[in-house]
């Protein structure tokens, strides 16, 4: 018998539905009118989910979410700008690394890995340095599962007259975001996260006026969002070979997203998954890294067992043998591992994951204390 697909307890790629996978069985011509309509419908729905309205446009881009982050920063941020980067994890640090490579001045505002970015501290930083023109914020720092207070920070940026660019890679579709109401300049996410598509397409939902002002600014040909959007407006086509099957899967995933009840229902299911997971893991003796007030219901970081018998590779393999795939830790201050709560999963799968983890502890002789 063929091996059953493992359940991915990761923040993307993730376990997808049969309907989403089946959508990839058809081949599409990248210049065909039917595929152009598919692109248009997906982009319209992404703007709708973001609460963007007519003032915003969606620019899809081939590649991972990081491709879209770099494309957005390289296109929207002028070379003489100065960007504030609140930093409480690896994905915030990645934004700083991109800005460094682009030659754009930036200031990192450090926070602990378990500390949400403070809107008050950001306000103070903007008040101290009038040269700061933009804030680049990670909404949900996936290295810990930490939720940053987007609405409060957006209000500070609006009051200070600074542009706000949001990496919503692991929050878009699961958490409420009101793009136009928050006056955000750009929001970035990807197909293979909380929308429950497959990896391979990033996208930016950008204020139309900001994008139109960015002609010729990007130092890259392939990552130029302005040129990508302008070409799509003229031709209804992608500039370069599109990820046709990825887009078709995302169309199917979006249909299921709306059938489920949109963001409120998706977020509620993930919250149930998260609560089921945390309760079960605590019963085994594990403790979450984050305080519950800072924890997003997308991925949970747990402290690793202190027992010398614990080693993540063997622990991972034992859980994998039981049909579940964990995610390694990505923190600098503690030995941890991560368990995702997203994908085409419910509370039953989370209970199964807890049982698999308990079985791994027993089989490896790991004592929890």
From Swiss-Prot:
Q: Which PANTHER family match?
A: 2-AMINOETHYLPHOSPHONATE--PYRUVATE TRANSAMINASE
The record's note on quaternary structure and interaction partners says: Homodimer.
Q: Which residues carry this modification: N6-(pyridoxal phosphate)lysine?
A: 193
Per the UniProt entry, the Enzyme Commission number(s) are 2.6.1.37
Protein name, entry field: 2-aminoethylphosphonate--pyruvate transaminase
Record-linked HAMAP family: PhnW_aminotrans_5 (MF_01376)
Q: Which Pfam families does this UniProt record tie to the protein?
A: Aminotran_5 (PF00266)
Q: Give a GO molecular function annotation for the protein.
A: 2-aminoethylphosphonate-pyruvate transaminase activity
Question: Which controlled-vocabulary keywords does the entry list?
Answer: Aminotransferase, Pyridoxal phosphate, Pyruvate, Transferase
Identify the enzyme class: transferase
Q: What is this protein for, i.e. what is its function?
A: Involved in phosphonate degradation.
Catalysed reactions, semicolon-separated: (2-aminoethyl)phosphonate + pyruvate = phosphonoacetaldehyde + L-alanine
Biological process terms in GO annotation: organic phosphonate catabolic process
Q: Which cofactor does it need?
A: pyridoxal 5'-phosphate
């Amino acid at each position: 018998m063929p091996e059953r697909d493992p359940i991915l307890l990761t923040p993307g790629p993730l376990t997808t539905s049969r309907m989403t996978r089946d959508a990839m069985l058809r081949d599409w011509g990248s210049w065909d009118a039917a595929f152009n309509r598919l692109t248009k419908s997906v982009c319209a729905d992404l703007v709708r989910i973001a609460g963007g309205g007519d003032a915003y446009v969606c620019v899809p881009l081939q590649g991972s979410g990081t491709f879209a982050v770099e494309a957005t920063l390289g296109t929207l941020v002028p070379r003489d700008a100065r960007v504030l980067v609140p930093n409480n994890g690896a994905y915030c640090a990645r934004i700083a690394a991109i800005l460094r490579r682009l030659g754009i001045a930036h200031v990192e505002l450090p926070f602990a890995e378990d500390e949400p970015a403070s809107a008050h501290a950001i306000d103070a930083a903007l008040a101290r340095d009038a040269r700061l023109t933009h804030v680049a914020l990670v909404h949900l720092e996936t290295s810990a599962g930490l939720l940053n207070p987007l609405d409060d920070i957006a209000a500070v940026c609006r009051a200070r007259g600074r542009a706000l660019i949001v990496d919503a890679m692991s929050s878009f579709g699961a958490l409420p975001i009101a793009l136009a109401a928050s006056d955000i300049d750009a929001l970035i996410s990807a197909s293979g996260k909380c929308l429950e598509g497959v990896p391979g397409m990033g996208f930016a939902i950008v204020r139309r006026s900001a994008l139109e002002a960015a002609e010729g600014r990007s130092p890259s040909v392939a990552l130029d969002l302005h040129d990508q959007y302008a070409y799509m407006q003229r031709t209804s086509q992608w500039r370069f070979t599109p990820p046709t099957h990825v887009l078709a899967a995302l169309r199917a995933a979006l249909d299921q997203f709306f059938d489920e009840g949109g963001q409120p229902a998706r977020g509620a299911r993930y919250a149930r998954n998260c609560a089921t997971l945390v309760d079960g893991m605590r019963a085994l003796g594990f403790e979450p890294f984050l305080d519950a007030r800072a924890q997003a219901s997308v991925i949970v970081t747990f402290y690793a067992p202190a027992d010398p018998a614990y080693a993540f590779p063997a622990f991972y393999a034992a859980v994998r043998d039981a049909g579940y795939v964990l995610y390694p830790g990505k923190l600098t201050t503690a030995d941890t591992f991560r368990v995702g709560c997203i994908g085409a999963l419910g509370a039953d799968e989370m209970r199964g994951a807890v049982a698999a983890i308990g079985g791994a502890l027993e089989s490896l002789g790991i004592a929890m204390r």
